Design a protein with these regions (language model features):
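Short, basic/aromatic beta-hairpin or loop at an interaction surface
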Residues: 1-17
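Short beta-strand-centered aromatic/proline hotspots
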Residues: 4-9, 31-32, 41-53
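Short, solvent-exposed secondary-structure boundary/capping segments
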Residues: 15-20, 54-67, 96
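Short, well-ordered loop/turn sites that connect or cap secondary structure elements
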Residues: 26-28
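Charge/polar-rich, low-complexity and marginally structured segments
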Residues: 82-204
């Protein structure tokens, strides 16, 4: 059974935020994640567009820990090693834009009838699951026209990941990049500058 990586702490129709169970262990930017839904057999897919770590206290901020009162200097990972209590006072969270769901065993790349409930489990997807989801590219449009997220960077990241997942398969990595590039070109045919910027980001 695949271990869950966190749980939903905020949920809307178009996005959800999860708290990671391990400090600094969020899935990477652009990762496809899966949240459990209330309906039997339904899961909701999201793409991670923001990762943040901060104080668990509302309105609180992390304190400087790199220098002790005795003048000892601590750097980077040493700080976490010297202060294991940081895992109790800090929390890593990640937000994902909803790009589809599974219902009755079928992947649907539009918004689910209900968002995943707060406190429900969130999982990373496998390479096989990512390949299956990205076979259809309807979600490209969702990303390109989403507001308040780094949509172009996010689209490029998921295209690169989906292509890498196909390395060693019959179609292969390059074939997917070509297919994805054509789809992006058709969606952005009237915005050459934006199109070329995305194509540069997915170039192998």
């Amino acid at each position: 059974v695949q271990p869950r990586i966190g749980e939903v702490i905020e949920s809307t129709t178009t996005a959800f935020t999860a708290g990671a169970y391990e400090l600094l262990a969020a899935p990477p930017f652009g990762a496809l994640v899966r949240a459990q839904a209330r309906a039997e057999g339904m899961v909701v897919y999201g793409l991670v567009y923001e990762i943040r770590t901060g104080s668990k206290e509302p309105g609180g901020r992390a304190l400087v820990r790199g220098r002790t009162y005795a003048g000892r200097e601590l750097y980077d990972a040493e700080i976490y090693h010297e202060h294991p209590d940081l895992a109790e006072v800090l929390q890593t969270e990640f937000s994902a834009i909803t790009v589809g769901f599974v219902e009755d065993g079928r992947i649907r790349q539009y918004l689910p009838p209900q968002p995943p409930p707060v406190h429900y489990s969130v999982y990373e997807t496998t390479g096989e699951e990512l390949m299956r989801f990205s076979e259809v590219t309807d979600f490209f449009r969702t990303l390109l026209f989403a507001s308040q997220i780094p949509s172009d960077e996010l689209l490029a990241a998921i295209i690169r990941s989906a292509a890498r997942a196909r390395a060693g398969t019959a179609g292969g990595e390059r074939a997917y990049l070509v297919q994805a590039g054509r789809e992006v070109a058709s969606l952005l045919k009237d915005d050459y500058d934006r199109l070329t910027a995305i194509l540069r980001r997915i170039r192998p």
